[in-house]
C-alpha cells in the first residue's frame, strides 16, 4: 500500500463527538505506524430556520432555529496493512458520519 493515501471526512451535529472520533482515528493510525496529517477543521455549515409562532396573525412573533454541521478531515499517508485492519475494526460514535476515500 505504498504511495497511497486514505482521506477520512467526519460530519456531525455535535462537535465533541467528532473530536472524540477524530482522536480515536489519529491514535489508531499512529499506533500502527502510519503517518497522519490532521485533523483539519473544515468550515461549519449553519442552517437557519425561521418559524412563525402564531397560527394566523402576528407576523412579528417568530422562533429561529439553527442546525450546525461540523466537519473534520484526516489524511493518512502511506498506510500499512495493520492500519487498514485497525481502522476497519474501529467502532465510532453513532452521531458521526464517516466518508473514506482512497487516493
UniProtKB/Swiss-Prot annotation:
<dbReference type="GO" id="GO:0006412">
    <property type="term" value="P:translation"/>
</dbReference>
<comment type="function">
    <text>Involved in the binding of tRNA to the ribosomes.</text>
</comment>
<keyword id="KW-0687">Ribonucleoprotein</keyword>
<dbReference type="InterPro" id="IPR001848">
    <property type="entry name" value="Ribosomal_uS10"/>
</dbReference>
<dbReference type="Pfam" id="PF00338">
    <property type="entry name" value="Ribosomal_S10"/>
</dbReference>
<comment type="subunit">
    <text>Part of the 30S ribosomal subunit.</text>
</comment>
<dbReference type="InterPro" id="IPR036838">
    <property type="entry name" value="Ribosomal_uS10_dom_sf"/>
</dbReference>
<dbReference type="InterPro" id="IPR018268">
    <property type="entry name" value="Ribosomal_uS10_CS"/>
</dbReference>
<dbReference type="InterPro" id="IPR027486">
    <property type="entry name" value="Ribosomal_uS10_dom"/>
</dbReference>
<comment type="similarity">
    <text>Belongs to the universal ribosomal protein uS10 family.</text>
</comment>
<keyword id="KW-0689">Ribosomal protein</keyword>
<dbReference type="GO" id="GO:1990904">
    <property type="term" value="C:ribonucleoprotein complex"/>
</dbReference>
<dbReference type="GO" id="GO:0000049">
    <property type="term" value="F:tRNA binding"/>
</dbReference>
<protein>
    <recommendedName>
        <fullName>Small ribosomal subunit protein uS10</fullName>
    </recommendedName>
</protein>
<dbReference type="GO" id="GO:0003735">
    <property type="term" value="F:structural constituent of ribosome"/>
</dbReference>
<dbReference type="GO" id="GO:0005840">
    <property type="term" value="C:ribosome"/>
</dbReference>
Amino acid at each position: 500500500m505504498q504511495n497511497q493515501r486514505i482521506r477520512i471526512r467526519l460530519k456531525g451535529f455535535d462537535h465533541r463527538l467528532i473530536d472524540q472520533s477524530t482522536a480515536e482515528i489519529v491514535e489508531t493510525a499512529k499506533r500502527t505506524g502510519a503517518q497522519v496529517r490532521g485533523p483539519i477543521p473544515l468550515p461549519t455549515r449553519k442552517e437557519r430556520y425561521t418559524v412563525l409562532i402564531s397560527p394566523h396573525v402576528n407576523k412579528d412573533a417568530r422562533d429561529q432555529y439553527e442546525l450546525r454541521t461540523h466537519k473534520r478531515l484526516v489524511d493518512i499517508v502511506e498506510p500499512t496493512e495493520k492500519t487498514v485492519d485497525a481502522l476497519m475494526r474501529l467502532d465510532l460514535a453513532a452521531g458521526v458520519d464517516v466518508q473514506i476515500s482512497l487516493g
